[in-house]
Amino acid sequence: MMTDNSKTRVVVGMSGGVDSSVTALLLKEQGYDVIGVFMKNWDDTDEFGVCTATEDYKDVAAVADQIGIPYYSVNFEKEYWDRVFEYFLAEYRSGRTPNPDVMCNKEIKFKAFLDYAMTLGADYVATGHYAQIKRDENGVVHMLRGLDKGKDQTYFLSQLSQEQLQKTMFPLGHLQKSEVRAIAEQAGLATAKKKDSTGICFIGEKNFKTFLSHYLPAQKGRMMTVDGRDMGEHAGLMYYTIGQRGGLGIGGQQGGDNKPWFVVGKDLSQNILYVGQGFYHESLMSTSLDASVIQFTREVPEEFTLECTAKFRYRQPDSKVTVHVKKDKAKVVFAEPQRAITPGQAVVFYDGHECLGGGIIDMAYKDGEPCQYI
């Protein structure tokens, strides 16, 4: 027997891109009562004075008309500024490297937007993320990696709670990106040929250094090796991240062994940037980390220990870890030393295909000693 989906209302977050367009199309084809909503999170114009949000909204309108669904625009600029951008700036001020996409999903797309969707009578919200939702026999929702390994976005969704996931659909999770493009082209959607957006949501394609300098004054300082050699001047600690290679302005010639130079540490109090030679420089290696803002996708005890795998940045293979959880904090011990564990970034836990949740890295340690990363 066919399920009658017509009484189930799904509000789709539509960005004007191909993924969210196909999300809306698939749900409409499956018979759901679909409404499209465009979120305006950032007041912006590109370098030609064109408001990119206006262009994106036109694409949403065109696709919604093609599919035959109602659509609205909602303004979350204040919520975005207060909950995501202020956090982003505070992290950079404290010498850390934040991941605003993780916070945007937690606070905007699956909180502010979810709340708004409920006022439209939504049973569920849906987005174009590459992740999968599976409900077990007890009604508990499990979040699984997207089938397209190169596009899986569970890393960025790792702060979602069971409550949020219960109300969420990810219709693209079982598809390859190439299939999504093909569906859009076959349906003749206005966004079928539109290129994917890159970069942080509110910066887009702009130069990151220039953008950041509008909001945080840069303080130049000394660039040093760990053993105290002065290597010149840095442009401001906020412009560098642990393990970074480019943009240092020092070639291999100063080191004697011609290995490339990397950022290996920061001292915020002295405004010193530490650099060292070699991809696996000893200062870049650590054996454990402390994390806070720990969120699991399911109900868990206040204190427990977990053997699983983890990612410490988006595009990296999983590593085996032991996680000691206490309330919203965790100590994560690595089976093998890890490179460039960066405070402010997300650590995300997995059990096979399932994303279990994650937290924000506060400090890395090497054999119990804190690494000089902030």
UniProtKB/Swiss-Prot annotation:
Residues 99-101 are annotated as: Interaction with target base in tRNA. This is tRNA-specific 2-thiouridylase MnmA. Disulfide bonds join 104-201. It is found in: Cytoplasm. Catalyzes the 2-thiolation of uridine at the wobble position (U34) of tRNA, leading to the formation of s(2)U34. SUPFAM superfamilies: Adenine nucleotide alpha hydrolases-like. ATP binds at residues 13-20, 39, 128. It comes from Streptococcus equi subsp. zooepidemicus (strain MGCS10565).
